[in-house]
Amino acid sequence: TLFHYSSIVYFVIYLLNADSIKKWQWIGVIFICYALAITGLYITPIIGYIGWEPVNSLFIHYYSDSIIEENVNIFNIVHLGQVFCALFMLFIVDKIKYVSPFLIVALKIFVIGLCIKTVFSDLPVVANRSSELFTSIEVFLIPTALYGFFKKQLLYVTINILYSLIFFTYSLITWF
């Protein structure tokens, strides 16, 4: 084949509107995804009904592996920190959207990544891979949003360094 099956998830990015954002709709999506995960209603069983054989075989493989593993912890400090940052940026998006023409679409991609991790938390391989694929945009998004909000270079650099140090320290602690 000419592409990997996982590249299909990139098609979602093509459908995003980069000019405007309905912030309450995106905030609602985050809360709905968490509500589904808390109640134990996952969309993972629905994927099994897709009639495309490569997707079904991958799904069966990942699902059989996930029975051995635990679910993804969507209440860890890293994920909740990302959700808090996304909600904060959604609340101030009208103030910061003029910093970069890519900020709105980057914020939407970031929220999609967070929601994928939350909704597929019962399938760790899919949740982590897909989430990391989309949430890697935070490298651009968070510094740009901080600069747009504070408009002071030293302050936003300091906050960005603290944010990075907190998550780096957390990843070191959980690594060992």
Model-predicted segments: where are they?
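Membrane-interface junctions at the ends of membrane-embedded or membrane-associated helices
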Residues: S20-K23, T144-T158
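Alpha-helical transmembrane segments and their membrane-interface exit regions
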Residues: F3-Y5, A18, P54-L58, S136-I142
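Residues within membrane-spanning alpha-helices of integral membrane proteins
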Residues: L107, V111-L114, E138-L141, N160-S164
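Membrane-interface alpha helices of multi-pass inner-membrane proteins
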Residues: T1-L16, T118
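Signature aromatic-anchored transmembrane alpha helix within multi-pass, membrane-resident enzymes
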Residues: F31-I32, K151-S171
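Alpha-helical transmembrane segments and terminal signal-anchor/GPI-anchor hydrophobic tails
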Residues: Y14, A18-S130, T174
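Transmembrane alpha-helical segments
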Residues: V12-L16, A86-M89, E138-F149
